[in-house]
Amino acid sequence: MSFSGMVKEELSRQTSTARHCRIAETAALLSACGRITKDGSLRFQTENDAVVRKYFTLLQKTFNIDTEIAIRESSLLKKGNVYHIEITDPLQVQNVLQGTKLSVNEADRGTLFPENGLITQQNCCKRAFIRGAFLASGSISDPEKGYHFEIVCQDEAKAENLRDIIHTFQIDAKIVLRKKSYVVYVKEGAQYSSNEKLSLSSPATEPVLPSVNLPSA
């Protein structure tokens, strides 16, 4: 398992005791991996089993929704599975969208986007949102081999939203366009004006992997 995989596996097992933080993390996961289908269902899709397990747990603990995980083989050349969770009940879909403050972009295949900053007003919720975004589409290198942290976003607006959240911790995150995706990244040697560490771990838990913390000056 890669270093990123180990970090994600560890984070997938941590669930915040605060509902507002669980909502923020759910919003980030759905923003990256979710969409509304033509029939109105809320579909979540990922190739990472740790990510789908975390989303499954968040639905149960935050919205009291019990659903099933569907597993299909990837249709791409690379081997692996694709994991799906689909919510078909209109009331449950509405509750999740209202709770996470996500809007639907009908022009972009029903993808989801955070409407405003209501769910990330507190620092703990900002960390939870970044944690969800990292789980969904992020990677981190082994600090012993050179630090690099990045999260791939589907569009520029999502990348800017995520970058701005990271900036609130006085961390110099930047955006680069790569293969039609927008990547928010933090590199080794970035200068921070704050000694506060951006811990991706849940506040109630100690980070098992020290590298889950972004370095501070």
Task: Describe every region a protein language model picked out.
Residues N213-A217:
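Conserved alpha/beta core segments of nucleic-acid transaction machinery
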Residues M1-S41, Q45-Y55, L59:
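N-terminal, positively charged regions that mediate nucleic acid binding
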Residues T46, R53, T57-L77, H84-S211:
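DNA-contacting interfaces and partner/effector-binding or oligomerization modules
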